[in-house]
A protein has these predicted regions:
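Alpha-helix N-cap/loop-to-helix boundary motif
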Residues: 1, 13, 38-42
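Intrinsically disordered, low-complexity regions enriched in Ser/Pro/Gly/Gln/His and often acidic
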Residues: 1-2, 88
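Short acidic-aromatic low-complexity motifs
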Residues: 2-27
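A general structural-boundary detector
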Residues: 8, 33-36, 80
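A solvent-exposed, acidic/Ser-Thr-rich amphipathic alpha-helical stretch
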Residues: 18-20, 24-71
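A beta-strand edge to alpha-helix "cap/lid" segment located at domain peripheries
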Residues: 54-128
Length: 128
């Protein structure tokens, strides 16, 4: 992973464009949700979950407050306020040799934040 891949992630996040998101994901991408026990395997499921998250955080004060990156991985700490609940979390992203996201793990705190995200994500996923 290099600066262009991380910059591409930030651009897709800002745009919320589903086609651009899919283009960033490896065919065998895996998404690890803070509220779903099993990892979600494959580009389509990963895109679906990330797309729902984009919609949950749209219109909030979501922002990354810290970034730690290496050649193939990044840890991106974020904060957002959803319905008055301050949420703090970390996106752990791994890029494969082709520069596509192959693993995306989300960790969130506090418990009230996880519960609120779960509630909002369920609504978004049902509408997709």
């Amino acid at each position: 992973m290099s600066a262009p891949e991380l910059a591409a992630w930030h651009e897709v996040l800002a745009s919320g464009d589903p086609a651009s998101l899919r283009a960033l994901l490896a065919e065998d991408a895996c998404f690890h949700s803070p509220v779903v026990h099993r990892p979600q395997q494959g580009r389509e499921l990963t895109a679906m979950y990330l797309g729902a998250a984009f919609r949950v955080f749209a219109g909030t004060d979501f922002r990354y407050v810290r970034e730690i990156a290496s050649d193939t991985d990044a840890a991106l700490e974020f904060t957002a306020t959803i319905d008055g609940i301050v949420v703090n979390g970390v996106d752990l992203i791994h890029w494969n040799a082709e520069g596509r996201i192959s693993d995306f793990k989300v960790m969130v705190r506090p418990l009230k934040g996880i519960e609120k995200i779960r509630e909002k994500m369920a609504v978004m996923l049902e509408s997709m």
